[in-house]
């Protein structure tokens, strides 16, 4: 396991040295000139160059006949058709084509010839008639051209003339710059001394370099080699830059991928630094900018040759160095330079010292470096600073090699006049993923060597490996058998078998040994080439044989691995792209170039499985069985289907013909899952329990689903080991990481639970930090029924304690461990639940019922089992204590009682210590006190951090007191005041209620409990009632106090309390009966207080009944709008004059109040309706101006903008949050600001965003007031009519009806608030909508018919 790299990467790379390069497809064709067809003797056209055309996905070739100067350009389309784009003669004979480019966007061909001509050919894309092609010479370099190269963006042409001038031209052949190459250029230095580093890396001058060369010569003369007698601070030698005999002395040009710089490599004659009278030839390269300005020159490197290639997506420049005269250290190396010309690493190509390297070239994504030799092409990849030879192509007379500019692993090269197109792909050579053979075996090709790492045995970080074996030649493909003990590798013409006796022998250090080298001639013809290899079990090997147009598969019997025999050769009649074993190694499966996947059995019988919509670069095949929740383990062949899963080059994942997902980077399968990684850095799982495949849902942010796991950026699948629930990934930098995905771990846990293997399930949960609740939650009834089995299997006390103490109330199988086995494949992934709000947490606690608690249920069941068996009780004492302490609420009293019963003091002390570990020691201390066991409390206190000076005196005092007093003191200390009162009352049980009891009741508000204690002793209960009545009066609960006083016979106090409670009938009844002399004063006091509270009818009743004051009574009835009672009282008292003196003025006053109210209401309705219409019109015309207007600023708040201020949007201004707080949910308003905001909302100041809401609410308040006034208005109308004030009555009724009609006509318009205006944002930044304000119902005014005119 390697720690994650937290540094970001500018570009996601998917290369991996754990994967091998294989040849997917190889095609070739030989272009022939149309003018020479049928007349080969007259003209001899040769293939000069070819390029990829990305616009039409075609290949453009240049054919030439140098003896007559004829040129022909042909375009070969993907469908096999051929277009002749140009055919012309050049003016010079025996010329050499240095550069050719096809500008498909402008239909132009550009040729650069060695003798100096730059020619363009512009063709007609419609007619494609070469006769209509316009040929132009754009310019000529008089002394010829040595090298030419177009930039990747096809905008700039860099050339070096034979006069050693670097010329840069634009696409329109306009000169950009010209620079003459001088020897002094090599003295330019961008080599920066940073003031640190090793001594031998620092510049010391040419004198020091000469001394080093002399030291090297002296060492050689003495016969010493290697590091013997070598000064470790001095290098063997300092390079002079001498060229080798195999250097072509050619000038080469290479552009950087971004086209900002290009490099020019050439041979220079420079003075010898040791002997200035002599000169040496030195190979060096110069770096120029796009504008042709010299940027840097390379340092001297002895043996560097002409090959040059700038890494397209990096800063390194690759070349070849041939090291000679170093004895055992002689080598041919690929060397790298930085842009400033300094060396930056190298690797040994392992080539013979006399083998010539023609060129080197990077592919478009910089993952592969092609080293081109005369008769073969080697492909190298790198990871973890190690270079691997992954593939070798064999040809003869290779003239050029080119990578496709867009398809990363498509290569084109020419040999003997043929154009060869080869497609490569990464292939993970690995063993089976089927239990129990899932050793995670990975085979890595590195030239002749096959590196083997069984990841289940050892996660060896690359480039290291566990075991290896070496073959006679470079390996083209390799495969592993079902048992992981036999390996097959193919060289150019040989099939090699290696084996180990057993995996156990490999563990002991034994490497696989080659047991058979099986030549190709033994089972096929020489025209067939060996391409791929795969196993059927351990007994049969399939070898993919290739010819130019067809593929065949040779099946070999290897039961005697030392003598393989040919079973049959299966004719496919199409080109095979990929060959591999199926999931269970019972068949071979292959894909043809049209996307068809077929299965091949051991007898050579073929069966088509599916045809992918697109060609895939990697695939797996497995038989998938349809299962359901009801019939989980039963399946048959009829309910299954062979399914092929494949990834295309553009990352599409298919299950047969169904597109499952896009942006997929790697895949693997197990017996239960399809696993794949994505470009979004996720590892996803698909259950293989149904053949009904559908597109997978998108993975959104915040997903919490067992089928999705985040992984390190750019990681890909290397292997899956189901028996260990592990997945091995490789990060972009090359390190391996073993992870244990939750879905695989949970699958194992669930399987163990259902099989009642609780200990295995527990160990897995404990190892992988899975919540132990799942042991119960996944099958609750099964768990309870087998609880004793569970306890016996677990066996260990600490494991049981861990299980019980970690229990929670949540059902984890419905939350974080929700099973997805039978969830629909297209169903959205589960999302992380929002955190509970404070209110939700509060309500959850409030609604908690211990009777239905899951934790309590499990703890009770455990206690029942353990307490029923004496052996269990003795062995699992700590577990019993844990169960008591884990109950909700915790039952510490029962745990402490159990501990107090222990006879062994050491065991008791140990149990107390353990209980204090489980719970807060202060809580345990108080629980011990609640048992009234002072010695146990002392034992607990000693485990705490309490000061002994505090608890020892207290405990001593308790010990010294008698039992009842001790219990009282303990309960008083613990705050159990009711129990303390009980103990206190028991102390003086036979006497009267003591002052101590009274004081304790008063100090702790225990009146009701005191009344309950003395329920059967009325005398003592009355004492409590007396102090309770005083307490009620002091708390303004006058009615209850008055009743209590009346019960006790304290009528004076009762009458006063009734007066305070405004209970005038009760107060007057006591006054009349017991205190007649105080009737008048009590009545006047009541009238005053009732009048103050607008209870005019009650006050009038007292005036009339107890003071006989008719006039005042009539006036009070009129104030209450009870004109009918006022008239009745006046007439009944035979005081008709009061009708005119009191009733009529009262009617007039009532008329004035009602009339004024109606006028105000009508004016308010009209004005507010008008303002509402203005606001809504303004909002509709310009919403931003409406919502974005400035809100009121406090006088003491600066409104000047600052760099840190946050601009409010019209959305957040209405919700009271800034853009930042609305997004993060973090409210930065202080409580003071919030209160200010609420006050502004309530005021609804004109011009603010709160005005509309305020106006609507104001109309609502008006309607409520009208409804309240309506009964009074009816009484006023009736009273006016009875007193013949018909005009006033008519006016009141008419105005009231008009106001109500006005409201009815406009109430819906007033209350129509838009959804946008109801939008709010809560404290968590979530948008919500306040409820719509219901439109109030306007009821009709009950009209009087006599004034309804």
From Swiss-Prot:
Gene of this entry: IKI3
User: Listed GO cellular component terms?
Assistant: cytoplasm; cytosol; elongator holoenzyme complex; nucleoplasm; nucleus
Q: Major place of localization?
A: cytoplasm
Task: According to the UniProt record, list the residues that bear Phosphoserine.
Answer: 529, 539, 551, 636, 828, 1198, 1202, 1205, 1209
Where does the record place the region Mediates dimerization?
A: 919-1349
What does the UniProt entry list as the effect of changing residue 828 to A? Does not affect elongator complex activity
**Matching Pfam families:** A-sol_ELP1, Beta-prop_ELP1_1st, Beta-prop_ELP1_2nd, HB_ELP1, TPR_ELP1
Q: How is it modified after translation?
A: Phosphorylation promotes the tRNA modification function of the elongator complex.
Record note on quaternary structure: Homodimer; dimerization promotes ELP1/IKI3 stability and elongator complex formation. Component of the elongator complex which consists of ELP1/IKI3, ELP2, ELP3, ELP4, ELP5/IKI1 and ELP6. The elongator complex is composed of two copies of the Elp123 subcomplex (composed of ELP1/IKI3, ELP2 and ELP3) and two copies of the Elp456 subcomplex (composed of ELP4, ELP5/IKI1 and ELP6). The Elp123 subcomplex forms a two-lobed scaffold, which binds the Elp456 subcomplex asymmetrically. In the complex, ELP1/IKI3 interacts with ELP2. In each lobe, ELP2 is tightly sandwiched between ELP1/IKI3 and ELP3.
What results from changing residue 1202 to A? Does not affect elongator complex activity. Loss of elongator complex activity, reduced levels of mcm5U and ncm5U on tRNA and reduced interaction with HRR25 but no effect on elongator complex assembly
Annotated organism of origin: Saccharomyces cerevisiae (strain ATCC 204508 / S288c) (Baker's yeast)
GO MF term set: identical protein binding; tRNA binding
Additional observations? Present with 10500 molecules/cell in log phase SD medium.
User: What residue spans carry the region label Disordered?
Assistant: 1214-1245
Q: What does the record give as the function of this protein? A: Component of the elongator complex which is required for multiple tRNA modifications, including mcm5U (5-methoxycarbonylmethyl uridine), mcm5s2U (5-methoxycarbonylmethyl-2-thiouridine), and ncm5U (5-carbamoylmethyl uridine). The elongator complex catalyzes formation of carboxymethyluridine in the wobble base at position 34 in tRNAs. Functions as a gamma-toxin target (TOT); disruption of the complex confers resistance to Kluyveromyces lactis toxin zymocin (pGKL1 killer toxin). May also be involved in sensitivity to Pichia inositovora toxin.
Q: What is this protein called?
A: Elongator complex protein 1
Keyword check for Cell membrane: no
Q: Where is the composition biased (Low complexity)?
A: 1214-1228
Q: What is the effect of changing residue 529 to A?
A: Does not affect elongator complex activity
User: Which effects follow disruption of this gene?
Assistant: Loss of mcm5U (5-methoxycarbonylmethyl uridine) and ncm5U (5-carbamoylmethyl uridine) from tRNA.
Q: Which UniProt keywords apply?
A: Cytoplasm, Nucleus, Phosphoprotein, Protein transport, Transport, tRNA processing
Q: Does the keyword Electron transport apply?
A: no
Q: Where in the cell is it found?
A: Cytoplasm; Nucleus
What pathway, per the record?
tRNA modification; 5-methoxycarbonylmethyl-2-thiouridine-tRNA biosynthesis
């Amino acid at each position: 396991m390697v720690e994650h790299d937290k540094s970001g990467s500018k570009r996601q790379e998917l290369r991996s040295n754990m994967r091998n390069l294989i040849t997917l497809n190889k095609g070739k064709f030989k272009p022939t000139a149309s003018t020479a067809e049928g007349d080969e003797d007259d003209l001899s056209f040769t293939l000069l160059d070819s390029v990829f055309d990305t616009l039409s996905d075609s290949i453009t070739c240049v054919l030439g006949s140098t003896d007559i100067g004829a040129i022909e350009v042909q375009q070969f389309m993907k469908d096999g058709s051929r277009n002749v784009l140009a055919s012309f003669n050049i003016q010079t004979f025996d010329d050499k084509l240095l550069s050719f480019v096809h500008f498909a966007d402008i239909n132009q061909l550009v040729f650069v010839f060695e003798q100096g001509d730059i020619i363009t050919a512009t063709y007609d894309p419609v007619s494609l008639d070469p006769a209509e092609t316009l040929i132009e010479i754009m310019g000529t370099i008089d002394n010829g051209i040595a090298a030419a190269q177009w930039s990747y963006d096809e905008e700039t042409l860099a050339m070096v003339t034979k006069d050693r001038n670097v010329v840069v031209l634009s696409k329109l052949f306009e000169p950009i710059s010209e620079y003459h190459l001088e020897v002094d250029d090599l003295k330019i230095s961008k080599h920066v001394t940073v003031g640190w580093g090793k001594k031998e890396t620092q510049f010391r001058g040419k004198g020091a370099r000469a001394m080093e060369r002399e030291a090297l010569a002296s060492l050689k003369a003495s016969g010493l080699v290697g590091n013997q007698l070598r000064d470790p601070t001095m290098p063997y030698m300092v390079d002079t830059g001498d060229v080798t005999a195999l250097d072509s002395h050619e000038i080469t040009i290479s552009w950087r991928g971004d086209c900002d710089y290009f490099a020019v490599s050439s041979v220079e004659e420079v003075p010898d630094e040791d002997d200035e009278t002599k000169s040496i030839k030195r190979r060096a390269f110069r770096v120029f900018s796009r504008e042709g300005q010299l940027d840097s020159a390379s340092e001297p490197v002895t043996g560097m040759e002409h090959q040059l290639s700038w890494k397209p997506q990096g800063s390194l420049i690759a070349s070849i160095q041939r090291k000679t005269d170093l004895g055992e250290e002689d080598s041919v190396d690929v060397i790298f330079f930085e842009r400033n010309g300094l060396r930056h690493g190298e690797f040994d190509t392992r080539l013979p010292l006399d083998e010539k390297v023609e060129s080197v070239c990077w592919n478009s994504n910089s993952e592969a470096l092609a080293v081109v030799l005369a008769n073969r092409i080697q492909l190298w990849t790198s990871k973890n600073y190690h270079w691997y030879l992954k593939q070798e192509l064999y040809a003869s007379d290779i003239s050029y090699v080119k990578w496709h500019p867009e398809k990363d692993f498509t290569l084109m090269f020419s040999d003997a006049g043929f154009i060869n197109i080869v497609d490569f792909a990464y292939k993970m050579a690995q063993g089976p993923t089927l239990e129990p053979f899932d050793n995670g075996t990975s085979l890595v090709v590195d030239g002749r060597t096959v590196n083997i790492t069984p990841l289940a045995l050892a996660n060896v970080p690359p480039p290291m490996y566990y075991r290896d074996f070496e073959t006679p030649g470079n390996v083209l493909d390799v495969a592993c058998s079902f048992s992981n003990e036999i390996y097959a590798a193919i060289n150019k013409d040989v099939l090699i078998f290696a084996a180990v006796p057993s995996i156990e022998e490999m563990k002991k250090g034994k490497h696989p040994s080659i047991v058979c080298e099986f030549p190709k001639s033994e089972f096929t013809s020489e025209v067939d080439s060996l391409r791929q290899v795969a196993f059927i079990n351990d007994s049969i090997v399939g070898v993919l044989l290739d010819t130019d147009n067809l593929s065949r598969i040779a099946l070999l019997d290897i039961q005697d691995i030392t003598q393989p025999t040919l079973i049959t050769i299966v004719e496919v009649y199409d080109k095979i792209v990929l060959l591999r074993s199926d999931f269970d190694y019972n068949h071979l499966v292959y894909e043809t170039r049209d996307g068809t996947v077929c299965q091949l059995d051991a007898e050579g019988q073929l069966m088509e499985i599916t045809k992918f919509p697109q060609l895939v670069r990697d695939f797996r095949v497995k038989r998938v069985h349809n299962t359901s929740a009801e019939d989980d383990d039963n399946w048959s062949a009829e309910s299954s289907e062979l399914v092929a899963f494949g990834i295309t080059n553009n990352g599409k994942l298919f299950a047969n013909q169904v597109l499952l997902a896009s942006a997929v980077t790697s895949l693997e399968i197990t017996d239960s899952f399809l696993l794949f990684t994505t470009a979004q850095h996720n590892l996803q799982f698909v259950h293989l329990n149904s053949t009904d495949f559908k597109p997978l849902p998108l993975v959104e942010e915040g997903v919490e689903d067992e089928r999705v796991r985040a992984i390190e950026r750019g990681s890909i699948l290397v292997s899956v080991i189901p028996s260990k629930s592990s997945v091995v990934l490789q990060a972009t930098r090359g390190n391996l990481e073993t992870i244990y995905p939750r879905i695989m771990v949970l699958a194992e846990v669930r399987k163990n639970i259902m099989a009642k293997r609780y200990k295995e399930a527990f160990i897995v949960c404990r190892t992988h930090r899975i919540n132990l609740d799942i042991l119960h939650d996944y099958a609750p009834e099964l768990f309870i029924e087998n609880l004793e089995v569970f306890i016996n299997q677990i066996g260990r006390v600490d494991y049981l304690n861990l299980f019980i103490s970690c229990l929670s109330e949540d059902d984890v199988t419905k939350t974080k461990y929700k099973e997805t086995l039978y969830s629909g494949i297209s169903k959205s992934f589960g999302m992380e639940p929002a955190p509970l709000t404070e209110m939700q947490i509060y309500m959850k606690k409030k609604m908690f019922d211990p009777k239905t608690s899951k934790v309590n249920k499990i703890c009770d069941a455990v206690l029942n089992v353990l307490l029923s068996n004496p052996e269990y009780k003795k062995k699992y004492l700590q577990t019993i204590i844990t169960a008591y302490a884990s109950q909700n609420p915790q039952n510490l009293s029962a745990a402490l009682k159990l501990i107090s019963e222990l006879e062994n003091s050491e065991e008791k002390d140990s149990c107390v210590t353990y209980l204090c570990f489980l719970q807060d020691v202060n809580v345990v201390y108080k629980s011990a006190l609640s048992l009234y066991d002072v010695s146990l409390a002392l034992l607990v206190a000693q485990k705490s951090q309490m000061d002994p000076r505090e608890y020892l005196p207290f405990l001593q005092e308790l010990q010294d007191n008698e039992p009842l007093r001790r219990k009282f003191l303990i309960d008083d200390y613990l705050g159990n005041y009711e129990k303390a009162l009980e103990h206190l009352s028991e102390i003086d049980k036979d006497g009267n209620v003591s002052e101590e009891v009274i004081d304790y009741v008063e100090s702790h508000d225990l009146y009701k409990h005191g009344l309950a204690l003395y329920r059967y002793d009325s005398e003592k209960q009355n004492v409590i009632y007396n102090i309770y009545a005083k307490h009620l009066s002091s708390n303004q609960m006058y009615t209850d106090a008055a009743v209590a006083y009346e019960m006790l016979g304290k009528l004076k106090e009762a009458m006063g309390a009734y007066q305070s409670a405004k209970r005038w009938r009760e107060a007057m009844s006591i006054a009349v009966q017991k205190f007649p002399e105080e009737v008048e004063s009590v009545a006047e006091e009541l009238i005053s207080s009732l009048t103050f509270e607008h209870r005019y009818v009650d006050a009038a009743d007292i005036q009339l009944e107890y003071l006989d004051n008719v006039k005042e009574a009539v006036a009070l009835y009129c104030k209450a709008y009870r004109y009918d009672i006022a008239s009745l009282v006046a007439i009944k008292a035979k005081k008709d004059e009061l009708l005119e003196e009191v009733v009529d003025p009262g009617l007039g006053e009532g008329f004035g109040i009602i009339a004024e109210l109606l006028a105000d209401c009508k004016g308010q309705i009209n004005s507010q309706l008008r303002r509402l219409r203005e606001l809504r019109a303004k909002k509709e015309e310009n919403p931003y101006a409406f919502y974005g207007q400035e809100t009121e600023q406090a006088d003491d708040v600066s409104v000047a903008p600052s760099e840190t201020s946050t601009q409010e949007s019209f959305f957040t201004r209405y919700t009271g949050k800034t853009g930042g707080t609305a997004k993060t949910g973090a409210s930065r308003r202080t409580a003071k600001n919030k209160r200010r905001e609420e006050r502004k909302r309530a005021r609804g100041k004109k011009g603010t965003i709160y005005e509309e809401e305020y106006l609507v609410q104001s109309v609502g308040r008006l309607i409520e007031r009208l409804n309240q006034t309506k009964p009074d208005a009816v009484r006023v109308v009736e009273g006016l009519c009875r007193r013949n004030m018909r005009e006033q009555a008519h006016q009141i009724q008419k105005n009231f009806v008009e106001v109500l009609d006005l409201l009815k006509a406009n109430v819906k318009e007033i209350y129509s608030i838009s959804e946008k205006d109801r939008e709010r944002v809560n404290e968590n930044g979530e948008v919500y909508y306040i409820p719509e304000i219901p439109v109030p119902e306007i009821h009709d005014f009950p009209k009087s018919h006599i004034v309804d005119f």
